[in-house]
């Protein structure tokens, strides 16, 4: 049975709430609906940055000490506003939507401690929007010993299977963290985080230029990357680990550029993201023939150029060039995952998160 599923995603980039509608049975996508976006205000973004700092001390996933309780209320309210605006703009009614997939805002991800924390009050959201809400997608995977990320690969596979091209294909999502999904003609599905995405660069731009991000990579294009710094950074043990593996937004926070000109810093961090993505190639079964880039990084032209320089003869293209809605893919994915969760279908696999067996997940909150 086809479901009308609305996905909501607030990623590690802390930019806002993405909203996207799809028609799906949890196995294939029948139709893409409209998408929307509700940006976080500077006050909300600052609150979330504080929540990330405070969350490093958490030992229980349900604890909300100090600023975390306030941040959870803000996240829930922002998502409720995002849904209300989306429904109004598209002249829909709540009853037109069968299920909402609500990721929440990750504030801590420590799979080695079997701990992952996403803030956002799903029962309160369901009451506010009058639609059933599927949430808490990662918990079952982490509790079973999985990495709890990435979760979008099953959706990437559904998208890639609609392309008539020779594999292997890698779909790269460059959000706060970068992750890849490797898809080949043998139906092999491998996924992992590869390293930083936009988070280090965004934080650097905010700190040095008071800008939220480097628009189209124009600032990085003015500088020359410090390749020696990148080589040292790539010596971190994470980069030699085989898939599956996952990261937290703050895992690279200790890397310091030192006192460098802003353009050099931006170029170095952009190149580091590209180099970290390319570093996964020797750890894959076969060398990819094509790379499809989605997420915020797909709009960074310097990032795309730097990735092309590092992947040999393979093609690198933005998802938009294929007719995919790059900014909406992660939100669409959580609508897709909500449909899969409702039907008890797997959300994660041994080769995506390292979980011992294919795992379903998600908890439903009804209005």
Curated annotation (Swiss-Prot):
Q: Which UniProt keywords apply?
A: ATP-binding, Carbohydrate metabolism, Kinase, Nucleotide-binding, Transferase
Read off the PANTHER family from this record.
ANHYDRO-N-ACETYLMURAMIC ACID KINASE
Q: Which Pfam families match?
A: AnmK (PF03702)
Q: What's the protein name?
A: Anhydro-N-acetylmuramic acid kinase
Q: Which family does it belong to?
A: Belongs to the anhydro-N-acetylmuramic acid kinase family.
Residues annotated as binding ATP: 11-18
Is Kinase there in the keyword field? yes
User: For this protein, what is the EC number?
Assistant: 2.7.1.170
């Amino acid at each position: 049975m086809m479901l009308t599923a609305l996905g909501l995603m607030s990623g590690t980039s802390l930019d806002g709430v993405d909203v996207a509608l799809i028609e799906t049975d949890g196995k294939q996508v029948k139709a893409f609906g409209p998408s929307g976006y509700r940006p976080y205000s500077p006050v909300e973004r600052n609150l979330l940055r504080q929540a990330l700092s405070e969350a490093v001390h958490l030992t229980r996933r349900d604890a909300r000490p100090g600023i975390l309780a306030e941040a959870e209320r803000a996240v829930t309210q922002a998502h409720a506003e995002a849904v209300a605006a989306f429904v109004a703009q598209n002249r829909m009614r709540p009853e037109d939507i069968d299920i909402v997939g609500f990721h929440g805002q990750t504030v801590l991800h420590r799979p080695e401690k079997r701990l992952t924390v996403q803030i956002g009050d799903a029962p309160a959201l369901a009451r506010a929007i009058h639609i059933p809400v599927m949430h808490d997608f990662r918990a079952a995977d982490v509790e079973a010993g999985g990495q709890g990320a990435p979760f979008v690969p099953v959706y990437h596979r559904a998208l890639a299977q609609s392309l008539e091209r020779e594999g292997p294909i890698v779909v790269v999502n460059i959000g706060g963290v970068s992750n890849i999904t490797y898809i080949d003609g043998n139906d092999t599905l491998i996924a992992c985080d590869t390293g930083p995405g936009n988070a280090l660069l965004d934080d650097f731009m905010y700190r040095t230029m008071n800008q939220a991000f480097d628009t189209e990579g124009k600032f990085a294009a003015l500088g020359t990357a410090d390749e020696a710094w990148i080589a040292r950074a790539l010596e971190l043990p994470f980069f030699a680990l085989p898939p599956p593996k996952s990261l937290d937004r703050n895992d690279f926070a200790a890397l310091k550029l030192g006192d460098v000109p802003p353009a050099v810093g931006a170029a170095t961090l952009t190149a580091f993201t590209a180099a970290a993505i390319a570093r996964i190639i020797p750890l894959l079964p076969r060398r990819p023939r094509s790379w499809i880039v989605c997420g915020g990084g797909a709009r960074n032209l310097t990032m795309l150029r730097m990735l092309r320089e590092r992947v040999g003869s393979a093609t690198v293209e933005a998802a938009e060039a294929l007719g995919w809605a790059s900014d909406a893919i992660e939100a669409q994915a959580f609508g897709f995952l909500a449909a899969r969760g409702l039907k008890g279908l797997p959300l994660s696999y041994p080769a995506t998160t390292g979980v011992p067996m294919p795992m379903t997940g998600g908890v439903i909150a009804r209005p």
